[in-house]
């Protein structure tokens, strides 16, 4: 799996950063791309990358603020002409996302050549697709804002070839049955497949947050995550300024990393008050502290393997 950032600014774009958009490549589990938020200009950002809109099967919106959704109508329209013809799309988001899209399409007389399934979240959501489980939980941002916990499928353990040979089963097509089924039959006897496989491995967990001030659901979403994507609109100064506007301060994120046992954190949604030089200087200062957890300030077009 791989996460790519097409927009990392907060509120407004800058000369260096677009508004919010994240792509999650599900390979090798699925040949699909999921988008999280579609800020203004997202489709233009995607043109500079190998990702194709036709491979986007799901879009998850964290909340209805403009820097997270103003690029959605244009991207949906372009998908009709960029490999998305007749390919269904699932759009998940807060209440109102369906009305927003349909009104935009109707008023602009735009017509899509593929179906959209809308899933509007109330308080929380559990969604299953292609072996993935996605949980959405409400955050604290003044308007409904959600964080998504994406859990990849479990990977089946490696076939124990010697154990299978011991029962007279030589390598061949039957091995695929052992790998993919709970039981298999050989020479008239039924065997439990798990007795001939190594331990299964849980797939990675990715936590992707919408805008929020600290709240209890953050720990539910990020618990033991392999990768967490979190906003830090304020990366210096007083914490109360961030919380007054229902946003997170860098110190809030660091506390969450430690409480939730997060392995790696990618910090986005940086205020446009910070330029690249500011961000680099603040990063160097922060990592001098031995208590600083593992994190990166991300920039547009950064990609990270999961």
From Swiss-Prot:
InterPro entries associated with the record: RibonucZ/Hydroxyglut_hydro (IPR036866), RNase_Z/BN (IPR013471), tRNase_Z_dom (IPR027794)
Q: What class of enzyme is it?
A: hydrolase
Q: Where does Zn(2+) 2 bind?
A: 67-68, 211, 269
Catalytic site positions: 67 (proton acceptor)
Q: Fetch the Pfam families from UniProt.
A: Lactamase_B_4
- Which residues are recorded as binding Zn(2+) 1? 63, 65, 141, 211
Q: Which Gene3D superfamilies match?
A: Ribonuclease Z/Hydroxyacylglutathione hydrolase-like
Q: Answer whether the UniProt record assigns the keyword tRNA processing to this protein.
A: yes
Please give the cofactor(s) recorded in the UniProt entry for this protein: Zn(2+)
Q: How does it assemble?
A: Homodimer.
Concerning PANTHER family, the annotation shows: ZINC PHOSPHODIESTERASE ELAC PROTEIN 1
Give the family from UniProt.
Answer: Belongs to the RNase Z family.
Q: What is this protein called?
A: Ribonuclease Z
Q: List the source organism.
A: Staphylococcus aureus (strain NCTC 8325 / PS 47)
The lineage is: Bacteria, Bacillati, Bacillota, Bacilli, Bacillales
């Amino acid at each position: 799996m791989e996460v790519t950032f097409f927009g990392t600014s907060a509120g407004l774009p800058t000369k260096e950063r677009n508004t919010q958009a994240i792509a999650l490549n599900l390979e090798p589990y699925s040949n699909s791309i999921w988008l999280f938020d579609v800020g203004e200009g997202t489709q233009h950002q995607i043109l500079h990358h190998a990702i194709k809109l036709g491979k986007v099967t799901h879009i998850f919106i964290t909340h209805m603020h403009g820097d997270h959704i103003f690029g959605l109508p244009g991207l949906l329209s372009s998908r009709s002409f960029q490999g998305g013809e007749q390919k269904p799309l699932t759009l998940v988001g807060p209440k109102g996302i369906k009305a927003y899209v349909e009104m935009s399409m109707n008023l602009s007389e735009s017509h899509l050549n593929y179906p959209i399934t809308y899933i509007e979240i109330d308080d929380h959501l559990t969604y299953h697709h292609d072996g993935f489980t996605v949980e959405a939980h409400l955050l604290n941002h003044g308007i409904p804002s959600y964080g998504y916990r994406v859990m990849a499928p479990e990977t089946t353990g490696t076939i124990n070839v010697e154990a299978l040979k011991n029962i007279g089963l030589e390598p061949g097509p039957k091995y695929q049955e052992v790998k993919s089924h709970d039981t298999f039959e050989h020479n008239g006897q039924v065997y439990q497949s798990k007795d001939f496989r190594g331990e299964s491995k849980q797939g990675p967990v990715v936590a992707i947050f919408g805008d929020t001030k600290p709240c209890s659901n953050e720990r539910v979403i990020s618990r033991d995550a392999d990768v967490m994507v979190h906003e830090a609109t304020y990366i210096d100064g007083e914490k109360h300024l961030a919380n007054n506007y229902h946003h997170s301060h860098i110190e809030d994120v660091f506390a969450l990393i430690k409480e939730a046992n997060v392995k790696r954190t990618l910090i986005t949604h940086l205020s446009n008050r910070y330029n690249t030089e500011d961000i680099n200087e603040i990063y160097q200062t922060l990592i001098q502290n031995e208590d600083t957890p593992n994190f990166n300030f991300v920039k547009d077009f950064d990609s990270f393997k999961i």
